[in-house]
Design a protein with these regions (language model features):
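A local structural motif
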Residues: 22-36, 51, 123-136, 145, ...
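Alpha-to-beta junction loops
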Residues: 48-58, 70-73, 104-105, 147-156, ...
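Extracytoplasmic/secreted envelope proteins and their assembly/folding machinery
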Residues: 9, 18, 44, 48, ...
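Flexible hinge/capping segments at coil-to-helix
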Residues: 90-105
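Extracytoplasmic "Venus flytrap"
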Residues: 1-17, 111-113
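Short beta-strand and adjacent tight-turn residues that come in two discontinuous sequence segments
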Residues: 4, 57-58, 76-78, 108, ...
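Pocket-lining segment of extracytoplasmic ligand-binding domains
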Residues: 61, 134-135, 140-178
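Periplasmic-binding protein-like
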Residues: 79-90, 170-178
Length: 178
């Protein structure tokens, strides 16, 4: 099983802390071990390589991309959808439309719900990822790039998104309605 600690994954945290899977699967003679993997790309790679057998709290985008690349993945269940938890933040308050992002440097993790958010947002204006300078990096690195001024927009989620809002950064868009 994968274990994702992000606050977006409260069911995962409760399940692990209460030992629900250990008890349920243990009753069937199946041992449960956890691998702490925090990105969907890492989770699907671990599944494809056989390092883990179950992904828990993985983003749909990562699963779709992995399956499209030939991974044998079966979706058994979903427990949430939180479009407002996936955000694009900037220091520049003039970035209010997809068109205003043209040529801007936007950083975030490729192959994730955040990447899908950006692509979907740009598509509302007939734009593609090629219309921006997209840089693949982790959520913490994207936020650090925004803090330091090396990126114009950071794709963030969970506590990092909350903190960006608390710092007064401008919410360009979230996943609501996309």
């Amino acid at each position: 099983f994968t274990y994702v600690t992000s606050p977006l994954n409260v069911p995962t945290i409760i399940e692990k802390n209460q030992g629900i899977f250990e008890k349920t699967f243990g009753d069937m003679g199946i041992e449960v071990d956890y691998a702490e993997l925090t990105s969907g790309a890492d989770q699907t790679q671990a599944l494809a390589s056989g390092d883990v057998q179950v992904l828990y709290a993985v983003g749909g985008t990562s699963v779709i991309l992995s399956a499209a690349n030939g991974a044998d993945i079966k979706v058994l269940n979903m427990y949430s959808r939180s479009p407002k938890a996936f955000c694009m933040y900037s220091k520049d308050e003039s970035l209010t439309t997809p068109e205003s992002l043209r040529g801007k440097t936007i950083a975030g993790p490729t192959g994730t719900n955040l990447h899908e958010l950006l692509v979907s947002y740009l598509a509302t204006a007939g734009m593609t990822i090629d219309d921006v300078n997209y840089v693949n990096m982790s959520i913490p690195d994207a936020k650090a790039g925004l803090d330091g001024g090396s990126v114009d927009v950071a794709l963030v989620a969970g506590a990092t998104a909350y903190n960006a809002g608390q710092q007064g950064y401008h919410l360009v868009a979230d996943g609501e309605g996309l």
